[in-house]
Design a protein with these regions (language model features):
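Feature captures the catalytic cores and cofactor-binding loops of soluble hydro-lyases/lyases
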Residues: 2-119
């Protein structure tokens, strides 16, 4: 049985060490996901995201720091499908995604701050 945690409970428990003040939106079909976190810094360039998600991601979540840029998308449908094929649980992006109509039907957790059609 999986134990559920609410965001406010986690924030209360770890208030000394949490400093995220970003409003993420869900873009994928999976609303809940968890796993070991792998990080990547990718300001306005998704090549590293593509490279990482092309590898086995069993039980992992990719956390991408795109510096909050809304100039380009760091994830689209093709890279998201690749992530699913490689067993990733989800992707959290401090930046934008594209192909939102397709992303919302893919069985992948995807959170980002917005969408942008430019790659």
């Amino acid at each position: 049985m999986t134990k559920r945690f609410s965001t406010p409970d986690i924030s209360d428990k770890y208030s000394d060490s949490l400093a995220i003040n970003i409003q993420f939106r869900s873009f994928g079909k999976k609303e809940y996901f968890c796993g070991q976190v792998k990080t990547a810094q990718c300001p306005e360039d998704n090549s590293k995201v593509k490279e990482i998600l092309s590898q086995d991601g069993s039980g992992q979540v990719l956390l991408v720091d795109g510096n909050g840029s809304s100039k380009v998308a760091l994830l689209g449908d093709m890279i998201a499908k690749q992530a699913i094929e490689n067993s990733w649980e989800g992707v959290i992006i401090n930046g934008c995604v594209r192909d939102v109509e397709i992303l919302k039907v893919l069985s992948l957790g995807i959170f980002a701050i917005g969408s942008c059609p430019v790659r």
